Amino acid sequence: MQVTLTWDLLIIIFFAIVMTYSLIIGRNESIKIITATYIATIVTHGVGGYIEQLSQQSHIILRTLGIAIDSTTILAIKLLVFIVTIVLIAVQGGIDVDYEDSGATDTGIAAVLGFATAALLLINLFTVLGQLPLLDPRMTTIPPLLTVAKQSLLAATMISYQHFWFTLPALILIATSFIGRK
C-alpha cells in the first residue's frame, strides 16, 4: 500500500495527534492548553511585531554588528516564542482548572477540546507562516499559504474560515463550562 504525503494527510494526522494527546491529558489540562495557546498567540504577535520594528529601525546597526534579521529569522523566533509560551504557561503558569470527573462526558469533552485545540494551533501556525497580523483577511492571498490552500481542501477551508477556527475553542470552553462544575 502506497501512501502519498499530502497537506490534507498532514492536517488529519496533526488533528489526530492533538486529539489523542487531549484524551490522554484529560479535560482539565486541555483547557489549560487552550488558554495557554490564546495567551501565546498574543505574546507571539507582540514579540514578533517588536522584533520586526526593531530590525527595520536598526538594520544599519545590526548589519554592522553582523546580525542578520530576515523574515526567516523572525519566523523562527515567532515559532519558538509560541511553543515556549504554551509550554511555560501550561506547566508553570499558575492556571488551575478543576472540573469534577464525570467519566464518559469528560472524555467526550476532552475529545472536542482536542479538536478545538488542533484547529487553534493550526490557524495560529498559518498566521505565523503567512507573517500576517492575527485574523488578517489577506491570509487567503499570501503566496506561501495560497500554495498550501491550492493543494489542500482542508487548509483552504481553515484559512478561509480563520475567524471561526480562532473563536471555536473559546465558544466550546464557554459551552462546556456548565458541565461537571464542582
List each model region and its residues.
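Alpha-helical transmembrane segments and their juxtamembrane interface "caps"
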Residues: 1-182
